[in-house]
């Protein structure tokens, strides 16, 4: 699948695709992991272990136990990304060789790891860290300590995407050259959309068309991470 291909291209040492075939999200995917912070060895035992049929979890224990010495020495790390079938959300699993346990990192925890990495690349200073009202408040607090701007939104990745689009319009407006009266009008328009929401995509398209493109290249990204506790994760990409 596409996830395995991307991990290989990114330089991950060994990539195992646990359940490429089979029914969608059956004994796989994120839903099975919700509300579970750790998975112990007895939870994959037959005939009644909770995760005995979850192929990725069973495979991660198998690989972890086979490489326990190396993992304890710190020479390798053994982890998994559990995706839903449509690929829009994931949880990260980390094998703990000292306890023979899998730690489950939800969307908030995975997003913070991603935010730390992006901040280290020096192009995300002051960028947005967007999460929803169901997220852990500590995630926003920590994101702020990294130099990001936390922003809270309603539950649903569509609301995260809307916040991102409005932020991009604000950035475009800030770098464009417009008469003061029109600039004030457009700022107020964006402010209103932030408060009241958008009922038609045409509103955003018309607003975008009314702001001239600028030759100025901004140094920093508008967005670092947009995430939900449930594992939906959004960051900037370029085609």
Where are these regions (language model features)?
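Phosphate-binding chemistry for phosphorylated carbohydrates and sugar-nucleotides
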Residues: 1-239
């Amino acid at each position: 699948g596409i996830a395995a291909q991307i991990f290989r291209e990114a330089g991950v040492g060994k990539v195992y695709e646990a359940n490429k075939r089979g029914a969608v999200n059956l004994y796989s995917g994120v839903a099975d992991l919700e509300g579970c912070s750790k998975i112990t060895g007895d939870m994959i035992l037959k005939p009644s272990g909770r995760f005995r049929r979850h192929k990725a979890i069973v495979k991660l224990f198998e690989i972890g136990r086979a490489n326990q010495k190396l993992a304890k020495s710190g020479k390798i790390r053994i982890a998994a990304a559990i995706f839903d079938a449509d690929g829009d959300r994931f949880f990260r699993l980390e094998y703990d060789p000292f306890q023979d346990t899998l730690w489950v990192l939800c969307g908030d925890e995975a997003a913070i790891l991603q935010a730390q990495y992006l901040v280290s690349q020096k192009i995300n200073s002051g960028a947005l860290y967007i999460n929803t009202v169901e997220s852990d408040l500590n995630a926003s607090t920590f994101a702020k300590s990294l130099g990001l701007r936390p922003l809270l939104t309603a539950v649903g990745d569509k609301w995260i995407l809307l916040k991102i689009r409005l932020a991009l319009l604000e950035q475009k407006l800030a770098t464009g050259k417009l008469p003061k009266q029109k600039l004030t009008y457009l700022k107020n328009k964006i402010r209103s959309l932030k408060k009241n929401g958008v009922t038609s995509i045409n509103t955003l398209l018309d607003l975008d068309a009314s702001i001239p493109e600028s030759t100025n290249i901004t140094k920093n990204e508008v967005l670092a991470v947009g995430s939900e506790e449930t594992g939906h994760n959004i960051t900037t990409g370029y085609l």
